Swiss-Prot record:
Keywords: Nucleus, Ribonucleoprotein, Ribosome biogenesis, rRNA processing. Its main location: nucleus. It comes from Pyrenophora tritici-repentis (strain Pt-1C-BFP) (Wheat tan spot fungus). The lineage of its organism: Eukaryota, Fungi, Dikarya, Ascomycota, Pezizomycotina. It is found in: Nucleus, Nucleolus. The gene is utp25. This is U3 small nucleolar RNA-associated protein 25. Residues 45-57 have a biased composition (Polar residues). DEAD-box RNA helicase-like protein required for pre-18S rRNA processing, specifically at sites A0, A1, and A2. InterPro entries: P-loop_NTPase, UTP25, UTP25_C, UTP25_NTPase-like. Coiled coil: none annotated.
Length: 680
């Protein structure tokens, strides 16, 4: 039990540039399109936008009507040559690839499900995507522009699964709490998914019952309680939702194709059921192995007769998941076991019978990518001709491990979100008469559903939430319960002192922190007692930020301290040397960065005292680093009374502090007049 007493006042794990998104040839696409039918144009195009594109993308009204009738003649698909197939399935681009805008195969099941039950199943899809009420949409967009949300608090679970949610809807009046979904029986699923969903997902636990209405109701979700234990369930649930959305969209296009084919020439029928480009789902993942796990989830929820390029995919993306011993933390093994390369992007195309991997982006329904890999794809080629039009019609983003993305370069994530749902620079064979009005009006960022899963929430993730998760359907932020904090569960019996320094501004916080460290922490280290047989001072200085690490390291160059340093950029030989010299007492100090610990989880020996230059965002890092001291006590290298932990913090680290000291104490730490707080 811990008691508080107031005493006084960017690494990137890189590989050679990927080319998956451009490696598929038109002939490969033709092979999997043998049962597809194009979403044909209606008679009226969206004239205003068409003027912004080259005239090569426009066609005469007469030609468009004739094309609609000709393309719907019954032609045996197996007799279609590649050239004919290209003319049916899309307009060839300048690079020779074929772009098939929302061209989906004829699906008998679409007709089979066209009854009252199917209409009931599509209510959420209909309301949010297919046919939103224009007046309500305008009202909610106005509320979002004014940043006015009606909020309500949600609580669920108990014990270690207890959590809290804040549901925000862009309306003036408070909404009734959403009805919890108890199982997949309560979800609006396409019939093709029901059986597998019942077998693989089944009933929801208490936490899932709280977040499922937001997921399947097309609201944004920031889930800040992802764990190794619930990761697989969250993956299955989000993949089920993504598949359901693709099937809903495909069947809607097929039905409207049939209506257009049956309509007389003198009837100006209009069915707006598409976006500018085909890709609808974007999975932002941390490693290639995570991509394999998502694909496995998709294929167990939807059975495909054929999976094209599966062996090629597994050869490139999958590795055995047993390269670390059991003594490594579970979250570390989950993230880095298997293929941990983090520069990749790959398109996936779904037809009724086939899942095709390595489809070109413009022919894909789903894009799997890391933030780094996707940014590289956008920036490849001529800097003046960056291509991000394939992201213009993304309707669902699922970011699976945002906390791990933070440990890479978060700017890549910001870059990707800045390039979502922009008006395309080129037509890419788009039929504007089929494009939904809210796409044309530039409202897609507020219709897109964004699901972010993270082990915890940080200021950067909060910024993403506030800036890019502004859905007209609403948004839910869910966090784990930190009432007691991590410190309640620690049993090392070591004195842990939290010291607050004055930091007037968030912008000047790094300067204030360094000043406090130089004027208070370093002098206190020089006063530590030195004994002959102690094996050195054994002071580990944990520095979350690499920039702060460089600053501290440079300040020690001309000092009297003997020190070693380990960062994410330190090579293996120098790491071994630094650890050995620190353990043997040759170096009194060891500078250790947060990202070095994230990527390697070193078990460092010889640690007798710890100074946290800043509060770790990941509370597990605090536990593990304090545990270094605990192990030194067990080995009788230092007494419990001599061992110490000192944490430097400012009022700007409230979120990080809360996860460690608990919600019930964090207010005192950041607001009390005293600035030193001891925990035992």
């Amino acid at each position: 039990m811990a008691h508080v007493l107031m005493v006084t006042s960017n690494i990137n794990m890189r590989e050679p540039p990927e080319t998956e998104e451009s490696e598929s040839e038109a002939s490969d696409d033709a092979a999997s399109d043998d049962d597809e039918e194009e979403a044909q144009p209606a008679s009226n195009a969206y004239a205003t936008l068409l003027q912004s594109f080259s005239t090569r993308h426009a066609g005469s009204e007469e030609h468009r009507k004739k094309r609609r009738k000709l393309d719907h003649e019954e032609v045996p698909q197996e007799d279609i040559s590649e050239a004919e197939e290209a003319s049916v399935y899309g307009t060839p681009e300048g690079d020779g690839t074929v772009v098939d805008q929302e061209q989906h195969e004829t699906d008998d099941e679409a007709a089979d499900e066209d009854d009252g039950k199917e209409q009931e199943l599509e209510k959420a899809y209909e309301k949010h995507f297919a046919n939103p009420d224009e007046n309500e949409l305008a009202t909610r967009l106005k509320q979002i522009a004014a940043n006015q949300w009606s909020s309500q608090k949600l609580t669920c679970g108990s014990g270690t699964t207890k959590g809290f949610g804040v549901l925000q809807i862009p309306v003036e009046e408070a909404q009734t709490p959403p009805k919890k979904l108890k199982s997949v029986h309560d979800i609006q699923l396409k019939q093709r998914l029901v059986e597998n969903a019942q077998n693989k997902v089944g009933n929801f636990d208490q936490v899932e019952q709280t977040i499922a209405p937001s997921i399947f109701g097309y609201q944004d979700l920031l889930f800040g309680a992802r764990t190794v234990q619930n990761a697989c369930r969250l993956r299955d649930i989000t993949c089920l939702h993504a598949l359901n959305h693709i099937l809903m969209t495909r069947d809607r296009v097929l039905k409207n194709n049939a209506k257009l084919a049956a309509a007389p020439d003198d009837v100006d029928a209009e069915y707006r059921d598409q976006g500018f480009t085909r890709p609808k789902i974007l999975f932002l993942l941390e490693t290639k192995q995570a991509c394999v796990r998502v694909l496995d989830s998709i294929t167990k929820l939807h059975e495909f007769e054929q999976q094209e390029n599966k062996k090629r995919f597994l050869d490139s993306f999958s590795q055995p998941e047993d390269k670390f011993s059991e003594d490594r933390p579970a979250d570390f093994r989950e993230l880095f076991e298997g293929n941990d390369e983090n520069e990749f992007r790959i398109g996936v195309k779904l037809t009724r019978k086939t899942l095709k991997l390595y489809s070109t982006f413009y022919n894909s329904d789903i894009i799997f990518a890391s933030t780094l890999g996707l940014r590289r794809a956008i920036e490849s080629g001529d800097p003046k001709k960056k291509d991000y039009d394939f992201l213009s019609s993304i309707e669902m983003v699922i970011m699976e491990q945002a906390d791990a993305t933070l440990m890479q370069n978060w700017e890549h994530a910001e870059y990707v979100f800045e390039h979502l749902n922009l008006q395309p620079k080129d037509a890419h064979g788009c039929d504007f008469s089929r494009v939904r009005s809210w796409y044309l009006d530039g409202h897609a960022p507020h219709i897109r559903q964004t699901i972010v899963l993270s082990a915890f929430v940080t200021p950067k993730i909060n910024t993403l939430y506030n800036k890019h998760m502004r859905n007209v359907a609403g948004r839910l932020k869910y966090t784990a319960d930190h009432t007691d904090g991590l410190i309640e569960s620690l049993s090392y019996g070591i004195k842990q002192t939290f010291v607050r320094f004055d930091s007037p501004s968030h912008l000047t916080d790094p300067d204030a922190r360094f000043k406090y460290f130089s004027s208070s922490i370093l002098p206190s280290i020089t006063r530590l007692p030195r004994t002959v047989d102690a094996g050195g001072l054994g002071v580990l200085i944990f520095i979350p930020s690499y920039l702060d690490f460089v600053r501290v390291r440079n300040s020690l160059v001309d000092s009297d301290f003997s020190y070693a340093s380990i960062s994410e950029y330190t090579d293996a030989t120098d790491v071994r040397k630094a650890r050995s010299h620190f353990m043997n007492g040759k170096h009194a100090l060891l500078l250790y960065t947060g990202r070095a610990h994230h990527f390697h989880r070193y078990n460092i020996r010889g640690v007798k005292r710890v100074v946290f230059y800043g509060v770790p965002e990941n509370p597990k890092f605090y536990d593990e680093v304090v545990g270094f001291v605990g192990k030194s006590i067990e080995r009788a290298e230092i007494s419990r009374q001599e061992a110490s932990v000192r944490v430097c913090f400012s009022k700007w680290e409230k979120m990080e502090l809360e996860r460690i000291v608990g919600t019930k104490r964090v207010g005192k730490l950041v607001r009390e007049r005293g600035d030193v707080f001891d925990f035992v």
